[in-house]
């Protein structure tokens, strides 16, 4: 990751501004920022090459929200372009868009019941030991929640729901 960043002066300068905004003493957040910068942001650079207009503070805020599990990775990736290149405030975008990560067991219970009911063959596959089936069900839950469900909690709830089901 770091090689990608330091090989491009624009990325290197932007990353330094992001580190400053994050507070360089938090190596886990810095590492997460480097990962998003070297993978997701690099792919957007062809159409946005004026690095001095990139919004490092907003990117740092977005990374902080992701790190603190206030948003999912999918939401972070969806907001990345508008946050960095258009200067959209990520906190405002998340709140106004209803994109905060949903970690309410009660709220997710309905989604879990729906996806299990809609996918009996996949549930059967999971019961027969196919782990990929669980990932499929989690994916369906993420789709129904519009990317706001906490994936690990969703997997946990689906597993528990299936175990409690009568065959």
What are these regions (language model features)?
Residues 1-167:
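Charged, compositionally biased, marginally structured helical/coil segments
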